[in-house]
Amino acid sequence: MSHQSDLIEEDIQAYLKQHENKELVRFLTCGSVDDGKSTLIGRLLHDSKMIFEDQLAAIEKDSKKSGTTGEAIDLALLVDGLQSEREQGITIDVAYRYFSTDKRKFIIADTPGHEQYTRNMATGASTCDIAIILIDARYGVQTQTRRHSFICSLLGIKHIVVAVNKMDLVDYSQERYQEIKKEYREFTESLEFSDVRFVPLSALNGDNVVDESVNMPWYPGATLMKLLNTIDVKTQEQFTQLRFQVQYVNRPNLDFRGFAGTLASGHVLVGDTIVALPSGKESVVKEIVTYDGNLERADKGMAVTLTLEDEIDISRGEIIVKKGSLPISAKEFSATVVWMHENELEPGREYFIKHGSKMTTGHAQNIVSKYDVNTMESLSSSQLAINDIGIVNFVAGETLHFDAYEDNQGTGAFIIIDRLSNVTVGAGMINHAIDEKAQEYSAFELELNALVRKQFPHWGARDITK
């Protein structure tokens, strides 16, 4: 196992113990066709010694049949796992890989570059902390580069690493690197990225991937691996209100009734007064049950079972929140939609809407606009075709309880499912409810809400004018 960690070979239990408390970071690679995404991931795995001997032997064999690097090992084949991908030399599905360093554990999503697979890329981006945008040094910023950057912005990814790849094909030119850097910065000025880094590299030769490049002494910055190890993805939580979506009711016997689910945001303590929606009934948290024993507190991302002091009716798909911090409740809402199916989105047609663990029906009332991903302009449109991104007004069959996606991704996201085929045809991010409640607030209430949001942003108060 010469290409794997020595510790794994010597003591697997010690290795697992060492890694169980490391910070988990999810990142994706995306860009235009043949920018070298799969090769980059293969290089990361190879140079960080995360390839087993049998994997390396298989890749050496496959390189002779499907490789594109001549006599050298084609590291892209480590990720391009589908036979159709290898034969065509492209990535089709989202491929996930796992590796770790001394500091972090990583989950990598290798997403497709071809425009017809943009919906796959959106799926891969939905859970990631960091996006690596690959740009071919020969061609600069392409249409897919713009599209993927825009989707990353819509999905709330704040940390972007722009990897200018194939620097070996432009003679490691500093001038070319600076041109691309300027072009990308100009394009993304309107996107809400809090952190954008740039690194020139050659995934094929390993320059600035894991090890520093001797071919680019003019670049003083960190390698890609160092950036992945050091970018602070633990941004301060601005939305701290409890949102617990019930996945199922756990009733193993007559003496126990618990509500199982994962905290989408906030925290819950034993003794907290909670409200179940949509019923509005109140109770007190009696126990927080886990496989490893009971807890006094559960935080965002934890899967737990809550038991209550009172027997109140709560079913799958309902939501538990704290008293005094209710979500938005509405049937009609505006959402940003990524359309993923060959058949266009049809206003008026009934679809299934899956919001968290709740399944209901609903339809698009109207398509407000769609985005031109090249100019970021909002264009008037009456239809959304495959890979289009637009603003759509929806009407759900039941009242949904949500927060705006920009505030809380856990309760602000939903998927659209075809009722006949059960195929997921779209993904949505809720912007705001469509109602007239904003006009019902007094001037004092509006001023107070604005003051609270400005002076106490950590309270997570929503904008009542939306």
UniProtKB/Swiss-Prot annotation:
Entry's Gene3D superfamilies? P-loop containing nucleotide triphosphate hydrolases (3.40.50.300), Translation factors (2.40.30.10)
Q: What is its EC number?
A: 2.7.7.4
Q: Taking every annotated instance into account, which residue ranges of this chain make up the domain tr-type G?
A: 22-237
| CDD domains noted in UniProt | CysN_ATPS, CysN_NodQ_II, CysN_NoDQ_III
Major enzyme class: transferase
Could you tell me which pathway this protein works in? Sulfur metabolism; hydrogen sulfide biosynthesis; sulfite from sulfate: step 1/3
* Region G2, residue ranges: 89-93
Q: How does it assemble?
A: Heterodimer composed of CysD, the smaller subunit, and CysN.
Q: What is this protein called?
A: Sulfate adenylyltransferase subunit 1
Whose protein is this, by species?
Colwellia psychrerythraea (strain 34H / ATCC BAA-681)
